[in-house]
Design a protein with these regions (language model features):
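Extracellular C-terminal loop/segment signatures of secreted glycoproteins
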Residues: 24-47
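Acidic, small-residue rich beta-repeat scaffolds with periodic aromatic anchors
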Residues: 56-134
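Low-complexity, Pro/Ser/Thr- and charge-rich linker/hinge segments at domain boundaries
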Residues: 37-44, 53-56, 85-86
């Protein structure tokens, strides 16, 4: 259920793995009961390594930017479109912040712009845990 409307007939088509880290991309189609056809979610193909979270009703992504940096994003489906609502960046020592072994930054874009800095992994929002390695 890609848009979390309770209809389970949604479909993903694997487009392939790309880049040195094998980033996976998919096309996504959701069943529209009004038209009795599938509607394409255009933004889905741009979400790297998507993971559907039924628990948090969102789609999570992860990208290995480099051996010392990861980026994660949270998307929600609104009016048939996927909107990025949060981002998490993880850096390792020697990359951007040489004084730290690891730096984690979390940002939320909806309602209030929440910015959390220098987090320990146990301080990140719970919805990240399916995609962030511990």
């Amino acid at each position: 259920d890609l848009n979390f409307d309770g209809i389970k007939e949604d479909v993903l088509f694997y487009l392939g793995s790309f880049g040195a880290s094998g980033t996976k991309h998919f096309d996504a189609y959701v069943w529209n009961p009004n038209t009795e056809h599938y509607d394409k979610i255009e933004e889905f193909k741009d979400i790297p390594n998507p993971k559907i979270s039924d628990k948090y009703k969102c789609i999570l992504s992860r990208v290995y930017v480099s051996s010392a940096e990861n980026e994660y994003a949270k998307y929600v489906c609104t009016n048939g479109h996927l909107i990025k609502v949060a981002e998490l960046r993880q850096y390792w020592k020697g990359n951007i912040y040489p004084e730290r072994d690891r730096a984690v930054y979390e940002e939320h874009f909806v309602k209030a712009n929440v910015w959390k800095r220098n987090l320990k992994l146990n301080q990140i929002s719970d919805f990240w845990k399916p995609v962030v390695p511990f």
